[in-house]
Amino acid sequence: MATPVRGETRNVIDDNISARIQSKVKTNDTVRQTPSSLRKVSIKDEQVRQYQRNLNRFKTILNGLKAEEEKLSEADDIQMLAEKLLKLGETIDKVENRIVDLVEKIQLLETNENNNILHEHIDATGTYYLFDTLTSTNKRFYPKDCVFDYRTNNVENIPILLNNFKKFIKKYQFDDVFENDIIEIDPRENEILCKIIKEGLGESLDIMNTNTTDIFRIIDGLKKQNIEVCMVEMSELEPGEKVLVDTTCRNSALLMNKLQKLVLMEKWIFSKCCQDCPNLKDYLQEAIMGTLHESLRNSVKQRLYNIPHDVGIDHEEFLINTVIETVIDLSPIADDQIENSCMYCKSVFHCSINCKKKPNRELGLTRPISQKPIIYKVHRDNNHLSPVQNEQKSWNKTQKRSNKVYNSKKLVIIDTGSGVNITNDKTLLHNYEDSNRSTRFFGIGKNSSVSVKGYGYIKIKNGHNNTDNKCLLTYYVPEEESTIISCYDLAKKTKMVLSRKYTRLGNKIIKIKTKIVNGVIHVKMNELIERPSDDSKINAIKPTSSPGFKLNKRSITLEDAHKRMGHTGIQQIENSIKHNHYEESLDLIKEPNEFWCQTCKISKATKRNHYTGSMNNHSTDHEPGSSWCMDIFGPVSSSNADTKRYMLIMVDNNTRYCMTSTHFNKNAETILAQVRKNIQYVETQFDRKVREINSDRGTEFTNDQIEEYFISKGIHHILTSTQDHAANGRAERYIRTIITDATTLLRQSNLRVKFWEYAVTSATNIRNYLEHKSTGKLPLKAISRQPVTVRLMSFLPFGEKGIIWNHNHKKLKPSGLPSIILCKDPNSYGYKFFIPSKNKIVTSDNYTIPNYTMDGRVRNTQNINKSHQFSSDNDDEEDQIETVTNLCEALENYEDDNKPITRLEDLFTEEELSQIDSNAKYPSPSNNLEGDLDYVFSDVEESGDYDVESELSTTNNSISTDKNKILSNKDFNSELASTEISISGIDKKGLINTSHIDEDKYDEKVHRIPSIIQEKLVGSKNTIKINDENKISDRIRSKNIGSILNTGLSRCVDITDESITNKDESMHNAKPELIQEQLKKTNHETSFPKEGSIGTNVKFRNTNNEISLKTGDTSLPIKTLESINNHHSNDYSTNKVEKFEKENHHPPPIEDIVDMSDQTDMESNCQDGNNLKELKVTDKNVPTDNGTNVSPRLEQNIEASGSPVQTVNKSAFLNKEFSSLNMKRKRKRHDKNNSLTSYELERDKKRSKKNRVKLIPDNMETVSAPKIRAIYYNEAISKNPDLKEKHEYKQAYHKELQNLKDMKVFDVDVKYSRSEIPDNLIVPTNTIFTKKRNGIYKARIVCRGDTQSPDTYSVITTESLNHNHIKIFLMIANNRNMFMKTLDINHAFLYAKLEEEIYIPHPHDRRCVVKLNKALYGLKQSPKEWNDHLRQYLNGIGLKDNSYTPGLYQTEDKNLMIAVYVDDCVIAASNEQRLDEFINKLKSNFELKITGTLIDDVLDTDILGMDLVYNKRLGTIDLTLKSFINRMDKKYNEELKKIRKSSIPHMSTYKIDPKKDVLQMSEEEFRQGVLKLQQLLGELNYVRHKCRYDIEFAVKKVARLVNYPHERVFYMIYKIIQYLVRYKDIGIHYDRDCNKDKKVIAITDASVGSEYDAQSRIGVILWYGMNIFNVYSNKSTNRCVSSTEAELHAIYEGYADSETLKVTLKELGEGDNNDIVMITDSKPAIQGLNRSYQQPKEKFTWIKTEIIKEKIKEKSIKLLKITGKGNIADLLTKPVSASDFKRFIQVLKNKITSQDILASTDY
């Protein structure tokens, strides 16, 4: 047994050794010995258990060894026994030594733990400290997360510090040290709290004992010091002694701050010194009341008595708000009569007369002895005394009359603190009535309440004739001793106020002298009140003058004078007093030190000045290439993605060497790469070392990447001050220099903005090779250490023509290629050239350029079109035209090597390009910067953007360009100088004197737009709007609208003469003399219609494209002429047109005829002064010989098939695109007989067949029904005179604020200073107040999403549920016989968390911001975040949606469905239990409101504005709009009375043609008419789109006339509304369809050319099974030439919707193979689809036909024939009879089903 014992002993010894190296822990016994009042640091459980096991093993082994020793003593062998005992004794000694060491270690650990040292620990989160609280152990304190951010700066703010400290303790779950029953806390917790509050106090207020261990010592010390400093006179702790407030206080913010500090102080006093008082509320109320003057105290008590306490706010806050509101409401004194501060105690809360420090009058003192004299300015007429003297005099008079007894019955008391009027004399009351209720007032006249017996009205005399008397509501109180009039009510009703010293009561008309008796203001009753039987007049009392007096010399300090004079300049004040400009004799006392006004320094702080030459002095201290400044220019406005938008510039401060580079973006990687490249270039090529770089604080220069690079290179990066752009002025100026140089190069070369990067490179190179005026050296030579030689002739002119060698030329082919010079290639010895024929930019040094000094005719593309003086014959002209044409054809497909752009071949067909070629042969003159040449080789996105300054303009302050002008004054003058028509060509009457015009020199060519390109480029909106009545001349000069000049039309062209208007004879053949003769024939003066009713005085346009303007009894046709002066064509830029479009969208449609290319400009002056109204000019399509209109489609259907009408305004694009092409020019004459060449005759013949652009008003976005008006905080609360409404809004506001706190949208306790947060991360908020129709007051705090920075959001688009998805949901739920409920999710957006970092202003402290945690209303990403949050939640519980029906979710077993649109939900389940379980699950995560539930198997509710009735037992669903139609009936009741009732909503015929008929009305009438039409059609579109398919055709038909406010159009609309009101029960009816083989059936119809513009209309009705799904009537998207083509178009549209419905149903599990059945009544269409071959048709129709044929072959659809009479879709394309319309109503009611329709076909 000895061997095991020894082995075990060795193990014990080893265990003992390992136990010695364990961590410092304590046993459970040691912990139990610790006093309960002082907790220790806890030990990990596993270490305790291991340590306990080791101790137990030691004890067990020791006991075993001792037992073994006893057994050995009994052995016989003494020698063996001695040896064993010796060894065993040694082992026992070692074990005991180990145990002793362990015990010592335990004692040492216990001693250390008893010290309660606060140890620092570190984990993954950061540094923390462990301590125990009374409720928890091992609590961790992380200093970086638990921040106490309040810092006090004076002793008065200590209560606020303590209040915030209490919130801090509560928030982070420390022990509440403010509880009196706490004796001891953990010393480590005490140490943490001591550190925190010491940091809050700061060094200047450190009153804390650093060795203290009791937190109560800190609190008691703070209270004691605060009481001693702030409440010196409060020995008995009387509340409110240091503050006095009366009705003259106007600084509400300061008063609120003072009262809040008072409340906090009284709380601490109450907790320590007022424990006998059981109610804290009563104590605080008494404290606040103690601060109020007697004139204010009773009114506050009355308000507290009458207004209930808002439970949503604290009691002390309610008291403070009541005091402030009472002070604001009860002050009748005008602002100019209020003292800035009390003259005795300098307080701003009360006036001098109520001050407690006011001297005792009985002692004969007028002011305190210590008070310095206050001198007021006195006028020389001595009519006004100083306030002190006036007060003394008034007091003396009062003392002389002290023995006089006043009769209270003849006097009226003016109460400045009361809000009601009372009297004890019933005879003063008019219309007296006894009070039926027991009404009592508190605080009026007596200390107790008084009862009101009745009420009436007292008339106040308010003038000499007493005709304007005002009545005041007055209560009859017999208990009162006299009549009391409220000063507030008197001022409100009669504008009568008290004077400054209460000596006068009156207004501008009447003044009444007052009497002050025992501190109460009295006036004579007969001077103020008119008795019911007294009609005598009261004369106004004139004030008497005061005797004169002499002013003594006064002394005034500079500080006092500075404050009195409104903090103006000290030098001005000293000079004014020194030069005796004031009546007083003043001695100015100056302080020994320099005068310092902190208010002025803060309010008038300015940026430091940058003196001229300061940067030059800095640059001389650095060697060349060592100091650089850099900046970024951009973005350049361009719609092309392949155009670089930014330019980086670096300028050497010493040599002015400049380095530029252009980039697509300005992110950190791009800029860093370029800066690195530039620095390496300078160091390698110029052998210079870059040591410092100056830049602004843009994010591209202040990121970590570029800073790391600068540090690695040892470069000093100098940043400018915030918003101090002048500090980087050198880079700013060089940006302007380079950009203006590049703009000049682009302008002179007539190149597009895409070439701006090459122009910048060229400009930079040139500047580096020119001597700088400051240094006198070439920058390149100055910066380079090596000698540099420069040759001037090595520079090539930018944008000029040149010839380069073609190294790939073939034999017998020219070896030269025409090109355009760009700039030097920095990577080679050659130049960059643009080769139009190759569409490439290449580098070459094999070039040849012309000598421009010898021949000025061969210039760049701007001057390719030679003037007539250089052309000798037709051959030269044709050669020039051919050259320009070839160049244009090459430029139109330009493509850089590295930047592919859109090619015209990809945009247009060969036919369109051929028309472009024909137009390209007649380029613009050289002085037209927006000519056809640019249009030909420009892509669609940049068409018309030729104003280089406008495109290069940015928000950078260094570049300022005039966007409204194309040419500068200098350029404009040069343009005028180059004009070849003399001003003398226009006579005084504004007519063109053709005898002075040299027709050979005036050569302009006509430009037209290809008709096919018109449709493709214009899209669907061809509107050009002109506004600004004050600038008619500018407006008429526009190239887009013709050229009616000035503000009137005194002479107009009479186009009724056959010699001018004959269609068969070209106008170009007319002689100028004939034109002049026709102009002189017109003697009519044009006047425009005056204001009148909408839709009246309408004249129609005749077939000769004339405008008939009604002037009295005559109709005057008007023909507009084009300008011949280039000044008129160039002075009006497209930017102005865009500006005009934004200002007004509804100009009246007056047509401008531009079909004659030989017209000239005409200026006319209106003789009778009639101003020309704003014109809407449209071009009329040229009719053919047979009168048919062959112009292409130039407008798009304004109808919206699935939503209310919306507008896509493309008029700005049209203005830019065709601004230059609308210019008309004269043809060149070559012979004396004015005959045309054969070429021109052939050209004119072709032109006469071309169509022109039709400009009509675009469609404005419709307006929905008027919403409830929302108001803001000032109107709802701050300035709301209705106290009840204000109270309701306050409750709503606090409820909303509390709701945001409960939802944890933000944490008001964690706030940040605005200076710490970047401005782009702060989003301002607004509070919207509304009163709903049910009377509930609502407040909603929303973000200003319109001011959001792009840094605060990324993707904001989201998909949501639409109305068709709701209908699918209802049909499926009904077919599955499911239980349904509807509900709302309250404040839905607030459940979604924000991914971005956004801050909003703090709700209580606008100086701070709080971090936004949830998606608050108004943020751009809130809808997306909410949809994603809801989708994630529903997907997590097993409900999925799909791409076809976003917002519609269902489970895999299809037993639960939910459709969600924002916060409106409808839920369907297979059983009621599952439905309730799902709703309860939603309630656990969202706050819900059940809006509809099944009652007796019937669900009657509303969903998405529709009235829903679901009968589960019968299996029916009805959708109607009764509620909305009833509101329409009430709204338009008066208009509907004039409409005859009808059983159909549409008209029998539609004959209105807005393209031919012209409205004659004023602009304002037109605008108001269109606005009214948009509102009406918006409501009708809403009704139609929801569920009223019976008005589909009628609404879509009249919707095309939304911009035509004719009385017949209004009649059509009101007829539809009358029909809706009469048949409001019609809607959609669904029956339960249990058929498993449900089909998708569509019936279509079409009518060709039935619209006023020869467009076609199609109609489609769609069923799913036996229930109708969708109905729509649309105008065809393409022009159909036959009925068969229109029918094919309708079949395709019906099939497309059917296929979409089929796929959607498949995703929802409603059958995998739903057959599609198409029904039509067109036999030719069916035969055409069944043919094996197809005849050539229009491109788009052919594609659609082939798709249908392919589906028929695949048997995906079945095409059936129905008779024309049986086609129910016929009413969607044309007006039908009442019987046919009733048949369609039966379809909507599901009395005629799809199966009945199939029975009528060949199915």
From Swiss-Prot:
Q: Name one GO cellular component term.
A: nucleus
Reaction catalysed?
Answer: DNA(n) + a 2'-deoxyribonucleoside 5'-triphosphate = DNA(n+1) + diphosphate; Endonucleolytic cleavage to 5'-phosphomonoester
Keyword Nucleus set for record: yes
**Is Cell cycle found in the keyword set?**
no
Superkingdom as given in the UniProt entry: Eukaryota
Which residue numbers delimit the Integrase catalytic domain? 620-787
Q: Provide the protein's localization.
A: Cytoplasm; Nucleus
Q: What is its main location?
A: cytoplasm
Question: Which intervals of the chain form a coiled coil?
Answer: 39-115
Cite the Reverse transcriptase Ty1/copia-type domain residue spans from the record.
Answer: 1376-1511
Query: Where does this protein hold Mg(2+) 2?
Result: D1384, D1463, D1464
Q: Report residue spans for region: Disordered.
A: 1224-1250
Q: How does it assemble?
A: The protease is a homodimer, whose active site consists of two apposed aspartic acid residues.
Q: What else is known?
A: Retrotransposons are mobile genetic entities that are able to replicate via an RNA intermediate and a reverse transcription step. In contrast to retroviruses, retrotransposons are non-infectious, lack an envelope and remain intracellular. Ty4 retrotransposons belong to the copia elements (pseudoviridae).
Q: What is this protein called?
A: Transposon Ty4-J Gag-Pol polyprotein
Gene behind this chain?
TY4B-J
